[in-house]
A protein has these predicted regions:
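Phosphate/nucleotide-binding beta-alpha loop and adjacent structural elements of enzyme active sites
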Residues: 1-134
Length: 134
């Protein structure tokens, strides 16, 4: 298999976001923490990339989106690839309540030819729900 890792976050466009590094599940992007006091030493600038800008004309066959609540933004940054290549997708739906409904609709709008499957695997924690797009 041909794959590579990139030291960047998945997003809708190429940018830099401020991230609060608290460790584990308490880490987040700054906009989701407005109004709460933040230790400046925990703020990190993170390079964010859209998949479309990164892969250009490469053919993509599989994408896994498990980006801790930023799945919608990551899908927005992959519109061209999804329309052009119809890669198989695995999209996490459990980070934000609205994603259970909004993300299947978004995927179908990007490429109506997908068949969608919801699966809840026996993971710990037990609320992990995934959308498979074939």
């Amino acid at each position: 298999y041909d794959f590579r890792t990139v030291n960047a976050g998945a997003w809708s466009c190429d940018t830099v976001c401020e991230f609060i590094s608290k460790g584990g599940r308490n880490s987040s992007l700054i906009p989701y923490e407005k109004g709460k006091p933040v230790n400046p030493s925990r703020i990190k600038e993170i390079e964010m990339r859209s998949l479309d800008s990164f892969v250009k004309d490469e053919r993509i066959t599989y994408i896994k989106y498990d980006v801790e609540g930023s799945e919608s933004e990551a899908l927005d940054g992959s519109k061209t690839v999804i329309k052009r290549d119809k890669p198989k997708l695995l999209v996490s739906l459990y980070h934000r309540t609205e994603d259970m409904f909004a993300l299947p609709i978004k995927v179908t709008e990007l490429n109506p030819s997908y068949k969608l499957y919801l699966r809840q695997h026996p993971y710990i924690p037990a609320w992990d729900m995934n959308l498979y797009c074939i």
